[in-house]
Amino acid sequence: MASKKAGGSTRNGRDSEAKRLGVKAYGNELIPAGSIIVRQRGTKFHAGDNVGMGKDHTLFAKIDGYVEFKTKGALNRKTVSIRPYTGSEE
């Protein structure tokens, strides 16, 4: 009669859920106020003109407008700004 002793349990087998980080709105994209532009850990991108930063470093639009990515300053920081939407564009 074939038999097998019970195997031990493993301590592995779990993983954390993906956090869906990254750029959500790209350059020259028209977005409404309050839209999330970048979800990030830390300040990979810094807030520029008309952009706010949440407590988890999420960047969001303060006004309706077009997204602009630029590098600024001696440290070449990546900044995200919103160019205002006037209504006469497009």
Swiss-Prot record:
An example molecular function term from Gene Ontology annotations: structural constituent of ribosome
Q: Where is this region: Disordered?
A: 1-21
The alphabetical list of record keywords is: Ribonucleoprotein, Ribosomal protein
Its GO biological process terms?
Answer: translation
Pfam families reported in the protein's UniProt record: Ribosomal_L27 (PF01016)
| The keyword Ribonucleoprotein appears for this protein | yes
In its keyword annotation, does this UniProt entry include Ribosomal protein?
Answer: yes
The entry assigns this protein to a family as follows: Belongs to the bacterial ribosomal protein bL27 family.
What name appears for this protein in its UniProt entry?
Large ribosomal subunit protein bL27
